From Swiss-Prot:
Keywords associated with the record: Cell membrane, Cytoplasm, Isopeptide bond, Membrane, Nucleus, Ubl conjugation pathway
GO CC aspect terms: cytoplasm; nuclear membrane; nuclear speck; nucleus; plasma membrane; PML body
Residue span(s) of domain Ubiquitin-like: 21-98
GO BP annotations listed: protein sumoylation
Family label: Belongs to the ubiquitin family. SUMO subfamily.
Cross-link position per record: Glycyl lysine isopeptide (Gly-Lys) (interchain with K-? in acceptor proteins): 98
Protein name: Small ubiquitin-related modifier 1-B
Keyword Lipid metabolism part of the UniProt annotation: no
SUPFAM superfamilies for this protein: Ubiquitin-like
Propeptide regions on this chain: 99-102
Length: 102
């Protein structure tokens, strides 16, 4: 078990100078590892995605981020998506290719 799985880490995202509502989000990878992010409700989720990918050492376009089964786009904010404290974002490996079997 890696350190990351043993104790979830957290990262603070957003502008600390301004007031604002923050929530803690859990980002769970396919390997069940958790990283916690504290984000401002109006922060574009691109920041969270970039930070997660940097920690994992993978390019951002190689992963897909989902909230309640829907893909998260870079310009969306937690407020737009109706996210609440401790909500979960799932991360999956991007899959391309394949063909129809019809």
């Amino acid at each position: 078990m890696s350190d990351q799985e043993a104790k979830p880490s957290s990262e603070d995202l957003g502008d600390k100078k301004e007031g604002g509502d923050y929530i803690k989000l859990k980002v769970i990878g396919q390997d069940s590892s958790e990283i916690h992010f504290k984000v401002k409700m109006t922060t574009h989720l691109k920041k969270l995605k970039e930070s997660y990918c940097q920690r994992q050492g993978v390019p951002m376009n190689s992963l897909r981020f989902l909230f309640e089964g829907q893909r998260i786009s870079d310009h969306q904010t937690p407020k737009e998506l109706g996210m609440e404290e401790e909500d979960v974002i799932e991360v999956y490996q991007e899959q391309t290719g394949g063909h129809s079997t019809i």
